[in-house]
């Protein structure tokens, strides 16, 4: 009996270690599929998934779009009201993941441990956002776009305007309709 329980525990642990959570960010410009790195950013992925499960992102906008840098969303409504968020999470920027083109990372204030719901997708390799860069602590990467970079690039091309206190606000609202969490598949199954 003990042997069976041990074997079952190993199977469950091994199976979950191979699972790769994936989400689809449905926007008014199209869909963006993101593979989340639960192994390297467990707290950040759990935080993002909880917001997604609670439908928090539905109706929020990409409120900050800077061509040649990044697109940011997940915290403001179309009228630029900030949605009430949960408590901030610890910054997992020292996880080895880099702010490279197509990666998703947590937005935050100057306090390294202030990230809540807002995230950004890198349009280029942003080395200054990695630990040791311009902001010594860095911005926590927790996944990468696997499909829909054309949508990300299209969002980056939308004209922006100043709407104090915000700058770089898309003149045309780019709304996140929902964030769909896909059933998890093992990394091995994805390779086939």
Each model region followed by its residue ranges:
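Sec-dependent N-terminal signal peptides
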Residues: 4-13
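Cyclophilin-like peptidyl-prolyl cis-trans isomerases
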Residues: 11, 17-192
């Amino acid at each position: 009996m003990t042997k069976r329980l041990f074997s079952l525990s190993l199977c469950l642990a091994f199976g979950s270690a191979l699972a790769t959570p994936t989400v689809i960010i449905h926007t008014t410009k199209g869909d963006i599929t993101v593979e989340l790195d639960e192994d390297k950013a467990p707290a950040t992925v759990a935080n993002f998934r909880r917001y997604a499960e609670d439908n928090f992102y539905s109706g929020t906008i990409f409120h900050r779009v800077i061509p040649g840098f990044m697109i940011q969303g997940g915290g403001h409504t179309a009228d630029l009201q900030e949605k009430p968020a949960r408590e901030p999470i610890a910054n997992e920027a020292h996880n080895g993941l880099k702010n490279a083109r197509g990666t998703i990372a947590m937005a935050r204030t100057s306090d390294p441990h202030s990230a809540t719901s807002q995230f950004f997708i890198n349009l280029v390799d942003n080395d200054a956002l990695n630990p040791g860069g311009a902001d010594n602590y860095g911005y926590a990467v927790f996944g990468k776009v696997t499909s829909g970079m054309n949508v990300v690039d299209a969002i980056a091309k939308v004209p922006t305007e100043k709407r104090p206190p915000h700058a770089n606000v898309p003149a045309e609202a780019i709304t996140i309709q929902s964030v769909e969490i896909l059933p998890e598949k093992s990394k091995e199954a994805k390779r086939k």
